Amino acid sequence: MCLAFCGKEKQMASIVVSGRRRICGEARVTGAKNAALPILAATLIARGPVELENCPRLKDVENMLCILSPLGAQCEYCGDTLKIDTRSATGSVMPQSISKELRSSIFMLGPLLTRFGSAVCTFPGGCEIGHRPIDLHLKGLMMLGAEIREERGLIICRADRLKGAEIHLDYPSVGATENIMMAAACADGMTRIFNAAREPEIEDLALFLNELGYLVEGAGSSTLSVYGGEARREKTTHRIIPDRIVAGTLMAAAAITGGEIRLNDVCPAHVGSIAAKLKEAGCKIEQQGMSMRLSAPDRLNEIRLIETMPYPGFPTDMQAQMFALCAVAKGTSVIVENVFENRFRHAAELARMGASFTQKDRTAIIRGVERLTGTKVTAWDLRGGAAMVLAGLAADGETTIEHAELIDRGYEKLHETLNGLGAEIRLEE
């Protein structure tokens, strides 16, 4: 079965954040959205039913289920475990209304192509954060033997049988690496991916594919080897890794409010670059096993330079949240966005709250102010929306965030989590 909201139009929502609230307490980090999405696509090449533990209940995840279900998959949540059985799947044409809204729908191309010999989808959507071409995905699939053409806004892929190849990526794209991995797992022979992405989510997908009975080596390095074959496991259970961006956002929420937080079910190694910048801002961070504790000063120090980079560099998905943090820190901070060319839309909204900065091209120079002032702002994308929430927590008065439904694409009830830590956030439909 698919989730109830499939087919419903998006509802515009606002949230109201009361300012000057310290974030203090203990929270659990949910499963990683960016690990779950490609793994959901990979269930199409499983031999039997799959149980995904720690699977976040997010809009993007539910949209992926609303693509899988019409193709014939059976999907059902039991708590935070998602049960999927794709053995009865027969279709290879993705629902256009959903695939055009969801960038991760592109992950379905590789699995559908290898299973059915064809795949059809629209050009994918997602957050408006710059030009995110899918050419690396398509080039990789063509290197494996796929025939691909564009027709009336559709991507149409066909292949009798994919064959392993050596693929050199022009850029270490996470999505392209994942798509090629899934397609290559079912291809004839070995595929080697050079300049592969190294993100933890790549490692999680590789682990899942290995659990299905395929063989992927080198995940976490820049060279991946995928040995084509067939799935051998009749049933697979996999636990999704913790979401490093959720962890970073919650730590930033405590930091911007001068609070203290303990995070459980977090992987400290995955948030190393984020923790390093929070320490530079004056936070104390301790880690023990799968837990981390952050305590923040009353006012943060400047951060001399944040440059977004592919993993293990600083993640672009934390740039907006750190922009909000720097807006109220002492001194002058600099942020350089190297991954996307249009990811400063949140800056203009923060300016409405009193943030002081100059921006040119991919660089923002932020002069911290002592206080922001609550007002009406807009969430233009998922992470920008999270940044508005953090700014609202630290501001004087109330901050109303419009289009807040975008936040639900990557955070599982963020307002409830923060309210449990001392925030006062309410929803307004």
Model segments located where?
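Short, structured segments at the rim of ligand-binding sites
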Residues: 2-429
